[in-house]
């Protein structure tokens, strides 16, 4: 009887842990920082395929430059959040995001359930 209770309890704990785990492919905030917030440039593209050169410094600042004639240059600040990161572009309010793997060397930047940008290296 005790063995059944122990096994049932262990199964319940494992199931609960599986439900609380982040979805496969989602980057933890520290992994976002290690991959992207290093001061090295990477490419971001919008769902409409407007591309930018992005640079996030380890100190919490960021810049973007359009890679074509569309889009605008800007600067701002970033900080890690509980499940991703938040950014504030000059003249705009803060927005928070999660980052999810989306292929080889490609990541989706997500608000709620929608990708608002794709990052590549």
Where are these regions (language model features)?
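Positively charged n-region of N-terminal signal peptides that target proteins for export
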Residues: 1-4
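Lipid interaction determinants
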Residues: 18-121
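Bacterial N-terminal signal peptides
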Residues: 8-17
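General helical structural elements
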Residues: 6-8, 68
């Amino acid at each position: 009887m005790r063995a059944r209770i122990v096994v049932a309890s262990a199964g319940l704990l494992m199931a609960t842990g599986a439900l609380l785990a982040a979805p496969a492919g989602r980057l933890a905030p520290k992994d976002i920082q290690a991959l992207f917030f290093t001061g090295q440039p990477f490419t971001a593209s919008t769902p409409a395929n407007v591309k930018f050169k992005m640079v996030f410094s380890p100190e919490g600042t960021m810049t973007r430059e359009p890679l074509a004639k569309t889009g605008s240059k800007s600067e701002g600040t970033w900080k890690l959040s509980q499940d991703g990161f938040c950014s504030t572009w000059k003249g705009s309010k803060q927005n928070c995001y999660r980052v999810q793997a989306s292929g080889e060397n490609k990541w989706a930047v997500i608000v709620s359930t929608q990708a608002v940008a794709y990052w590549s290296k």
